Amino acid sequence: MADETRRDFLKAAAAATLGAGVPAQAQTSATSSTPSAGPADRPADLILRNGKIITVDVGFSIAQAIAIAGERIVAVGPDAAMAAHTAPWTRVIDLKGRPVIPGLIDGHAHMDREGLKAIYPSLGRVRSIRDIQDRIAELARGKKPGAWIVTMPIGDPPYYFDVPNILAEKRWPTRQDLDAAAPNNPVYIRSIWGFWRHSPPLVSCANTEALKRAGITRDTVSPVSTLKIEKGANGDPTGVFVEQDMQPLAELIWFRKATAFGRADRARTLPLAARAYHAFGTTSIFEGHGAATELLRAYMDAYRDGTLSMRSSLVFSPNWKTAGNAPLGPLIEAWAGWLGEPGPGNDRLKVTGLQVSINHGAADDLRAGTTPDTGWAGFNYDAGMPRERLKEVLLHCAANDIRAIAMANVTPGVIDLFEEVDRLIPLKGRRWVVAHISSLSPRDIEKIVRMGLVLTTHTNAFIYKQSDLMKRRLPPERHREITPVRDLLDAGVKVSLVTDNVPVSMFLPIWQVVSRMNIRQELVAPEQAISRAEALRCATENGAYLTFDEDKKGSLAPGKLADLAVLSADPLSVAETELRDISAAMTMVGGKIVYETTNWRG
């Protein structure tokens, strides 16, 4: 690579760093905010009493009350012990027996997507093409002629199951259907992000004016075999695009200008997204799939504006295309100052670690061509690279104390690859992450233990929605290897639960690892079930361990951050079938209420 090109790549990489824009108060080392317990008689600003405080401490103790001063916990214990922390100004809330847990920590959240869903009008609950036409016509009445009309997908969120069969016509709307509803405007109905449903196809629909603006005619040829431009008997496009993939391409290459999420859109909707997660008791997230530059900047904007209520640990998603075949050692070394552990940031926002994966396909190259726009992804589509090239990157990461995060479902053999690195530079203590585990053999688990790897699950996929696929991949005698959380915990592995934004409640994965129930009400490797207490620990303490924050959060103890949730039901005693339906009555981050339902104290 020419020196000039390489300098451009280094410059672009530097521009993505938080160091270029983190306020001074956020550039302190992560270790600077290690908590220290206050004096036993310190007055509290707030006391929650007469409750069931599930501390998730070492002994999983249960208390009645918790006292908070500033952003930290000063006492946990019986109601009577709170007198020592009560001052004239102390606010006291009677929990009336309600359960309280540490704030939940989502180990792979994709939180930003929840806010982005609010930008475009919903087509949820439509049951006919006429319903769709009525919605589009209503939107057209509020638009000037020629202005774009873009909507969310057809179907009912969060999963968008059984489309188009939910429509009376059992088909997708054509361009003519949409023309009739909005003859003077270009119309585009987006496809789903495939991981919401975990099954293709992804289908989007456009009217005649939208096709014209996209330059799509009867002669247009799809750039990849997985994307079909549906055409009628006369050879003209019908306006329907069908993708046998999980990440939409049509909207990126043909309708990008109409569908792109701007930096302001991302920053503006992050608070909406955070509130949706807070509604189920989540107070911290880890974005293990990585954040591209546009998403990093959006988080920084929200942080500067004081609207980022969620504690957010981000991972960098690189754009490798510009690097070409140049040696990557100097680049990784240059990143060490802001991606290493501990890195810049604070308890509210930090970026540490590098998301890595093996290879990418032709469709990913096309998606990457839209950089810096990343659509629903929020990560760079060309983060994958050949195995030997990736090994080079991993060795440089290990040498520079940069943590690597890889998703097992898109990085085949990642544990073996990490082991090759471990033979040269020991990984123990570095907490490298294997995400989206689907199945693990006993030998895999032995390697994980030896290297001290941290794991994040994806139970919404591999237990709930795709267990049939997992069973087909493995012989019956190996079905116990499907998301083997029981075996992992017994081996001492730290496992963090995740939502992947499908949907946002952490009580779904909590229920899934306890019940091992799939969408068809079938048990999946039931011998791998764990207890409710263990599931809560995976969703709290282990999530804190994932981000090197176990001394600051993850349990309710004096000196720790006052991140907690008052729940609608007791996760330790509610009927198992109702465990997944638990929500938060009140959620608190750093001693401040960030979410509460109306009259929850009544």
Regions found by a protein language model. Give the residues of each.
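N-terminal secretory signal peptides and thylakoid transit peptides that target proteins
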Residues: 1-16
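Hydrophobic h-region of N-terminal signal peptides that target proteins for export
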Residues: 18-23
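Boundary at the C-terminal end of the N-terminal hydrophobic targeting segment
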Residues: 24-28
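Divalent metal-binding segments
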Residues: 38-49, 54, 58-336, 343, ...
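Short, charged, surface-exposed secondary-structure boundary motifs
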Residues: 214, 322-325, 465-469, 507-508, ...
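His/Asp/Glu-enriched, well-ordered alpha-helical/loop segment
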Residues: 394-407, 412-432, 436-438, 442-446, ...
